[in-house]
């Protein structure tokens, strides 16, 4: 997947889709950039990725500050030395299929894995942004669909920002 990490100090709601030039990170795992966050809420603050917690994005604001999402959904910037959460974003292959679930928080999609014998489920790439996926085992295994990457895969993001202390900054 590609994540555009080009510096952007534009106001939330005015951010345009990053081009394929600038600082591009190509990897299967990363952080969302500000454009992807803004796309989840049409430039407002009440989209499906705003859950009242602070979390970092991949987008630099300046040479010393990075953009983050404030607990009220607004975009801010600060030194990356602060302890805001991170939301891992993973790009899954376009061939991944849904085994069961309806995409809600109470019944998230479960994806096909090594132990599944029925691989005829719905392609994940046909589902909608904001729907829930249970991916992996243990804690922190709930994700949201963010986007489909031009036929190469589906980008998902952790439903809740992760912190190494095990707690979240709420105010």
Specify the residue positions occupied by each region the protein language model found:
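Collagenous Gly-X-Y triple-helix signature in extracellular proteins
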Residues: 1-171
């Amino acid at each position: 997947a590609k994540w555009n990490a080009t510096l952007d100090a534009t106001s939330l709601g005015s951010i345009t889709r990053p081009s394929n030039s600038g600082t591009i990170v190509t990897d299967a795992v990363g952080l969302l950039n500000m454009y992807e966050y803004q796309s989840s809420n049409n430039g407002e603050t009440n989209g499906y990725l705003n859950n009242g917690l602070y979390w970092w994005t991949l987008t630099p604001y300046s040479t010393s500050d990075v953009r983050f999402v404030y607990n009220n959904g607004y975009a801010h910037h600060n030194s990356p030395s602060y302890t805001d959460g991170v939301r891992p974003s993973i790009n899954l292959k376009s061939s991944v299929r849904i085994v069961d679930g309806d995409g809600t928080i109470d019944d998230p999609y479960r994806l096909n894995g090594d132990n599944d014998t029925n691989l005829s489920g719905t392609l994940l790439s046909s589902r909608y942004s904001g729907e829930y996926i249970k991916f992996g085992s243990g804690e922190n295994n709930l994700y949201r669909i963010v986007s489909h990457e031009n036929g190469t895969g589906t980008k998902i993001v952790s439903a809740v920002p992760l912190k190494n202390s095990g707690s979240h900054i709420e105010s």
